[in-house]
């Protein structure tokens, strides 16, 4: 059977129509893809706060709690665990700490030998009358004393007014035994962290005559057992001694009157760690 012109036109028409339909279908699919792509981009361009509000929900307000940190100005006195009293596990410490009672001070400025201390570490006074009945003789003497001396490079020594101003800025306050003590608070409240004595016998300061006072050296000392957090208290003591030496032209010395180095300071810290380890072992 021969295919005439009419049949060829019909076949060509069908092919053209099919091509048009296929092209239209392809364009429709391509248009859907583009529409979806534009929708996604429009969502990505939304402001951050609106997107966060829809996806994450409203922000919650959380209570914040700052952990106390110890620096060279104040030590925390409330949130830290209290050191276990020696007389009984049920006795409480009072808000204000008493200065440590120290025995004879041998703080003569003899460069051949370091100062010797006989320190006593008292528990803080408590409000209960039964705790008040304990006497000082029940308190053991300090097993170790960490000493940092500051020797003036000037022949005239540390002048009283300048020395007083410097140590007051470091938080030391004049107290028992006529020497200076650093408490937990700059205001002089809380337990005693460390003390500072005159390196010349009898080791005291006369505030009434401070304008005419001078000394060739002073000694900072921290007894163990002593403050509840001895490592932190020691860091505060080092900061106070450094401030004094830098501002008043002094030189730092250790308990052997050798130059205080970073290695010596680290050795002091290791002594504190070792003491705490022994104390913990004895409690078990």
Curated annotation (Swiss-Prot):
<keyword id="KW-0472">Membrane</keyword>
<dbReference type="GO" id="GO:0043093">
    <property type="term" value="P:FtsZ-dependent cytokinesis"/>
</dbReference>
<feature type="region of interest" description="Disordered">
    <location>
        <begin position="47"/>
        <end position="140"/>
    </location>
</feature>
<keyword id="KW-0132">Cell division</keyword>
<protein>
    <recommendedName>
        <fullName>Cell division protein ZipA</fullName>
    </recommendedName>
</protein>
<dbReference type="InterPro" id="IPR007449">
    <property type="entry name" value="ZipA_FtsZ-bd_C"/>
</dbReference>
<feature type="compositionally biased region" description="Basic and acidic residues">
    <location>
        <begin position="119"/>
        <end position="140"/>
    </location>
</feature>
<feature type="topological domain" description="Cytoplasmic">
    <location>
        <begin position="23"/>
        <end position="284"/>
    </location>
</feature>
<feature type="topological domain" description="Periplasmic">
    <location>
        <position position="1"/>
    </location>
</feature>
<dbReference type="InterPro" id="IPR011919">
    <property type="entry name" value="Cell_div_ZipA"/>
</dbReference>
<feature type="compositionally biased region" description="Basic and acidic residues">
    <location>
        <begin position="62"/>
        <end position="75"/>
    </location>
</feature>
<dbReference type="InterPro" id="IPR036765">
    <property type="entry name" value="ZipA_FtsZ-bd_C_sf"/>
</dbReference>
<dbReference type="GO" id="GO:0032153">
    <property type="term" value="C:cell division site"/>
</dbReference>
<comment type="similarity">
    <text>Belongs to the ZipA family.</text>
</comment>
<keyword id="KW-0997">Cell inner membrane</keyword>
<comment type="function">
    <text>Essential cell division protein that stabilizes the FtsZ protofilaments by cross-linking them and that serves as a cytoplasmic membrane anchor for the Z ring. Also required for the recruitment to the septal ring of downstream cell division proteins.</text>
</comment>
<keyword id="KW-1003">Cell membrane</keyword>
<keyword id="KW-0131">Cell cycle</keyword>
<comment type="subunit">
    <text>Interacts with FtsZ via their C-terminal domains.</text>
</comment>
<dbReference type="GO" id="GO:0005886">
    <property type="term" value="C:plasma membrane"/>
</dbReference>
<keyword id="KW-1133">Transmembrane helix</keyword>
<keyword id="KW-0812">Transmembrane</keyword>
<feature type="transmembrane region" description="Helical">
    <location>
        <begin position="2"/>
        <end position="22"/>
    </location>
</feature>
<dbReference type="Pfam" id="PF04354">
    <property type="entry name" value="ZipA_C"/>
</dbReference>
<feature type="compositionally biased region" description="Basic and acidic residues">
    <location>
        <begin position="83"/>
        <end position="102"/>
    </location>
</feature>
<dbReference type="GO" id="GO:0000917">
    <property type="term" value="P:division septum assembly"/>
</dbReference>
